[in-house]
C-alpha cells in the first residue's frame, strides 16, 4: 500500500470542490445521446488529439459522484477526471465516456444500463478496442465501478476506484453493492467474482464521508486472490481524493498496460 504526501493537493482540492456546473468548460467534450428503456439520456465524450478512424482506440468509462447527478450534461464534467483531462487533452491517449446519472439514483439499475449503453455507442462511433476498455469512478461512482465490474466480469481490462466502497455510508443507505448473496462477505465475494481484474484503489485517510476502511478491506481481498491490485491512501486528505488520484503520474501507464485478452 502506498501513502503519498499531500503536497499541493489541498489547494487543488479546494478549487475542485468549489466548481459549479455553470462554470464548466465543455469545449473538450462532445455531447451525445443514447436511448434506454424508451428514454433519452445525454452523455459526454472526450476524443484524444489525433483521433481518426484508421485504428481502434482504448476507451475509459468515467462514473461521477452523487453531487454531479442531474440531466444538464454539464455537472458530470465538474469533478475528477474531466477537469484533469482538460489540462491534459493534448497527450491523453484514450476516448473517455462520461454519462450522467439522474437525480436521486445510483450506478445500478437504469443508470448502469445507460452508462453501458453510452460505452457501447462510443465503441461503435469512435472505433473502440474491446480489449482495451477501462472503468473508473469517484465516490458514488467508485461504488459504481465495483457494481459494474461485479455485474459484467470480464468486460474491462482494468479499473481505478476513488473513494468508493461496498457498504453504505451513513447518509446514503441505498448506496451499496447490489447482488451479494445473503451471508457472504461482500469483499471476498466481489474479489472472487471479478478476478483477475487489475484494480488500483485510492482513498483519503481522513475521509469522513466514505470510510477508507472499505477500500483497505477490498484491497486485502483482492490481494488474497493474487490479483494485480494497488492501493494508495493519501494522509490528511478527506473525501476529495480524486484530485491527487487522477494526478498520480503512474496511474495511466499502469492502466493502459493492461488488455482484456492478456488476463490470465
Task: Identify the meaning behind each predicted range.
Residues 59, 63-118:
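Active-site machinery of serine-nucleophile hydrolases
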Residues 158, 163-246:
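The feature captures the conserved acid-bearing segment of alpha/beta-hydrolase catalytic domains
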Residues 19-59, 136-138, 180-182, 216-220, ...:
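A domain-start/cap signature at the N-terminus of enzymes
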